[in-house]
Amino acid sequence: MGIGVKYKLISGMSVCPDHSIGETTMFPDAYFQTLRSYPNLENVLGDGIYASRWITDLVSKTQLTPYFLPKSNVTFQSKGFSGWYDMLYSLWENPQKWLEQYHMRSISETVNSMIKCRFGATLRRKLESRKATETKLKNVAHDIRRIGYIEILNDIKPKWPRKECS
């Protein structure tokens, strides 16, 4: 799930009810949805699970800086993925600045908590497609609530895309 740190809006999501599929395999889909939603993205933040060479390279190829906390036993060997070296070098060069940026990712945990508190635990559905639909609807409902708050508190009028009726 991609989440903006300023307004806590969900910018991209990839939902798979099959728990045998890991989060990292769903990263590209959510990431490219986020890029379409936020073309002026500056950084990409994530848990240590995303600190793999191919993911850091994917992010770097889109001219963005990845901030994924690497494990303690990693090396600078890029093994063909230049984004890996760039991320580790930026951490080595200025650890305080890097960690300051990285810890903005806690906002995504806040959003997960907000959704759970507002909408409760997942329903006990047997059909996998309904589980995915439930998750997507909760995320959309979260964004609608957040946009309502943004309109009121920040006096911002969002531009809703409108389709012509035929």
Regions found by a protein language model. Name each.
Residues 96-166:
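Basic, amphipathic alpha-helical segments enriched in Lys/Arg and hydrophobic/aromatic residues
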Residues 49-117:
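Helix-centered, glycine/charged polyanion-binding patches within enzymatic domains
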Residues 3-4, 68, 142:
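Hydrophobic side chains in beta-strands
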Residues 36, 75, 146-149:
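A generic secondary-structure boundary signal that marks alpha-helix termini
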Residues 1-48, 53-61:
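Polybasic low-complexity intrinsically disordered regions
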